[in-house]
């Protein structure tokens, strides 16, 4: 597929050639790459941007799926051009363990519409004090946060 008549983030004209579902070339005058039977889409001067990452999402699995679940969140993210999202731990129960984070990430992988990272709470169950669970977190847990609560004790935050 060849996308023509687009502009990049700087407002400059750009074409994209997509082969086998992946961007194979970005530039100008890419028609030679496409071939005669290739689909050509006219972007009509719209801006073409790379995928986005949302570092602060609330998909609410587990416990609050009536607000948003992994499938609806994944669909919304993909529709908006987001290929990766970071989920906050204010779920029920609070995501305070690697096992719970892995469960959410596995469910998201099964949906398969975007990459998902489940964050873990800084203090266990947002209790503001207990950080022992952090010692057991594997490297696969990339972020910790007390989303919306804040750690009120400076010493606890320093230890975390």
Annotated model-derived regions:
Residues 6, 21, 45, 56, ...:
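Divalent metal-coordination and catalytic microenvironments
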Residues 91-102, 108-160:
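Histidine/acidic-residue-rich, glycine-tolerant segments that coordinate divalent metal ions
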Residues 46-110:
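Metal-associated gating/positioning segment near the N- to mid-region
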Residues 39-41, 53, 86, 117:
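Hydrophobic/aromatic beta-strand patches that form the interior of the parallel beta-sheet core
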Residues 1-2, 7-50:
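Histidine-rich, glycine-flanked metal-binding segment
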């Amino acid at each position: 597929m060849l996308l023509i008549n687009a502009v990049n983030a700087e407002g400059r004209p750009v074409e994209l050639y997509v082969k086998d579902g992946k961007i194979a070339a970005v530039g100008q005058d890419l028609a030679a790459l496409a071939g005669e039977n290739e689909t050509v889409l006219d972007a009509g001067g719209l801006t073409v941007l790379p995928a986005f990452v949302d570092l602060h999402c609330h998909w609410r699995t587990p416990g609050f799926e009536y607000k948003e679940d992994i499938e609806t969140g994944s669909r919304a993210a993909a529709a908006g051009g987001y290929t990766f999202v970071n989920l906050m731990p204010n779920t029920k129960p609070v995501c305070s363990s690697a096992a719970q984070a892995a469960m959410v990430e596995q469910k998201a992988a099964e949906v398969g519409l975007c990459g998902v990272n489940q964050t873990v709470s800084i203090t266990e169950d947002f209790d503001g004090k207990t950080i022992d669970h952090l010692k057991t977190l594997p490297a696969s847990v990339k972020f910790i946060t007390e989303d919306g609560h804040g750690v009120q004790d400076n010493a606890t935050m320093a230890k975390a």
